[in-house]
Amino acid sequence: MASDSGTPPPPWEPTLSGSLPASTAIPLKRAALEEDFTPSVPSPLNPDVRSTPKPQGVDDMPAKRNKKESLKKRESKGAFGGDSNRGTPDPKHREPKQSDYSPMRYKLAPPKPSDFEPARPAVFTYHHDVPALDGGKIQFYETSEHVHNKKSYHYTHCIADPGFPSSLYYRGTEAEPHGPHLSFEDSATHLFFDQTGRHITTNKGFRMTRANVAIREGRFYWEVKITRGIVDKKNGEGQPESHGHVRMGFARREASVDAPVGFDAYSYGFRDVGGEKVYMSRPKPFFPEEEGIREGDVIGLEIQLPSERLQRKVLAGQYNPAVDTGLDDDSTAFDAPNIVRDRIPIRFKQHIYFEKIDYHTTKELEDLMNPSPVSSGPANSVEAPNPNHTVPALRTLPSSYIKVYKNGVLMGTPFTDLLAFLPPASKPQAQIGAREGLDNGMLGYYPAVSVFRGGAAEVNFGPDFWFPPPGIVEDPDNEVSMIDGGQDEPSKSYAFAYPGLDKIRPVSERYTEQIVEDIVYDIIDEVDFWIQDGCKVIDRFGQGEKAGHTGSLAASGRDEIKELVQDD
């Protein structure tokens, strides 16, 4: 039509069509495609790309790359949910759970009929007499036919009991004399006792014996009477004459019985010469000058230890002095320690004993006692033992102390902040069968006495003391008849004025608690083994209809259990 009119045609322009987008839509579409496929970081192939940000939906958002937590941290959060809210990790590790541990089980021969009989006492052979303070005589005996704790082993009496089939019939027991006394087994050789286990002497150099009761928490008191020692009479050199020497104090399981109490870092002692306190073989003045300890004096010893729950917090590195109190009586705590006793019955002459690997000295405390000038270990560091020390063996127990009385008069508090004794502060001797980190229930501070060349002493674990300490009041409504000093007479009983762990009690009460604990632990072990056997009793010796079932153990095939041989 334009050509017919003779007018020139207008410049060509693209026209819109339904199938072809407008010129402005083409670059927009391409821009959208470029945004979809443009990398977020420019590369050398397209350095000038500038993507236009646009809103993205939840599905289009790229996944955030978070650092993966370690397995140890995830397990820690699973066990302790409170850590998930921490801004920074807890620098103090958690106390490991010991609930998975059970006592080791051994293959044993069947018990003999004599094993079901009560434990036999030691044999007493008369040795000599010692003049008593009242003008009489004290008969001393040499004990025999019993085992001695040595070579890193600890022995306790046991008996076969048909009520404990899953434990292969053996459980703990006590031999005469019953009650708290100086232990015949836990003593050095060449010591002489009376038949009650309360008097002790020797004709050799320093020897030590521990009592048969361990103090683990609370306040306890006991007494030592010097029956043979330093006298007031002067010799030719102006020094007091001596019939021998006596030391007394508290000792842990690791303390050597072939040395006096206070010899190493595992015991705290007092010597009769000058009334000095002794720790790590370093005597220091304590009693007033010229005071000393003489024949006839009664030395009272009081010890206080915090609750076991607080002690475990100290050993786990979780102790906070601003929150944790040393006299926590544990009344609201429902958790109890898992006592694991790895022990095997052995025969010694006519006796049956449980043999256990005893706790052994540690390098850290030996370095503390004898620091090396060239050593860079913890003993030479500027950090003294304290509850939060980096080395568990050098951690101390808050609010712990030892007080000393002389003839009923408080002389002072020579020792505070006693070293911790629960694992991992105490470790067994490294050998086959020893497992670290376990508490066998025998750790603690034991009353201990050392004698030297004729020195003699008598112990009194209560409840009827020669000089009752403050805090004990006479209870007129509770009189009992007891034998004291060889005479039968009504004996006074004492009630204690303070509640909780700060109540002072005689060591004799702790002995009763220890017996109850041993019975409970025996029952727990029996139930534990019974559950391991599928909640049924298995005849391991092939004597019954279930002899074909052996569970986790098989009959040993031996005719006799292990026989122990020791030199007398």
Swiss-Prot record:
Domain B30.2/SPRY: 160-353
UniProt-listed GO biological process terms: negative regulation of gene expression, epigenetic
Subcellular location: Nucleus; Chromosome, Telomere
A single GO cellular-component term on record: Lid2 complex
Signal sequence interval, chain numbering: none
Coiled-coil residue windows: none
Region annotation Disordered: where it falls in the sequence: 1-113
Keywords from the UniProt entry: Chromosome, Nucleus, Telomere
Known role: Component of the COMPASS (Set1C) complex that specifically mono-, di- and trimethylates histone H3 to form H3K4me1/2/3, which subsequently plays a role in telomere length maintenance and transcription elongation regulation. Controls the production of several secondary metabolites, including colletochlorins, higginsianins and sclerosporide. Plays a key role in mycelial growth, sporulation, spore germination and virulence.
The protein's name in its UniProt record: COMPASS component cclA
Lineage of source species: Eukaryota, Fungi, Dikarya, Ascomycota, Pezizomycotina
Gene transcribed to yield this protein: cclA
